[in-house]
Amino acid sequence: FSLFCPLTPAVFAGNSDNEQLNKKNVIDFYNKSLNDKDFAAARPYLGDRYVQHNPMAKDGVAGFEQFIVFLKNKYPDSHSEIKQAFVDGDHVILHVEVTGREPGVTRAIIDIFRVDEQHKIVEHWDVTQNVPQKTASGNGMF
C-alpha cells in the first residue's frame, strides 16, 4: 500500500471542455437570474428538476421563479459580483459579493451548483454571511 498518489487528470479539475461549459453556463445563469432578475432568460440553464437546499427558497423550477420575483420586487438594486469561480466535474462553486440589498450591508456568498449531463443546473446549495467592517486577521473576505 502506498500513500503516494500519482497525479491524474482528476487532480487538475476544471480543465476539461465539459467543465468549462458547466462553469460558463452557471455564470451566465447567475448573471441573468440574480443580476438581471430575468427568469425567462435564466430558465434555459435549469434542468427539469431543480433541487434547492437553501432553507429560504422553495424547491423546483417554479420555486426558483418565485425567488426571482421576490428579488426583483424587494431588492431591485441588488447586484451579485462573482469574485471567483471554480469547477470540479459536475459541480461549480462561486464566491460572490452581494450589494444593494440593505444600505451599508455587503454579503459574502458561496454558491454551489450541480449540473447534469446536458450542462443544465439541477441542484443548488449556498452559505451566506454579512461582511464585517473589521476582521480579527485584518484580511478582507474577497
Identify the role of each PLM range:
Residues 2, 9-142:
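C-terminal and inter-domain tail/linker signature
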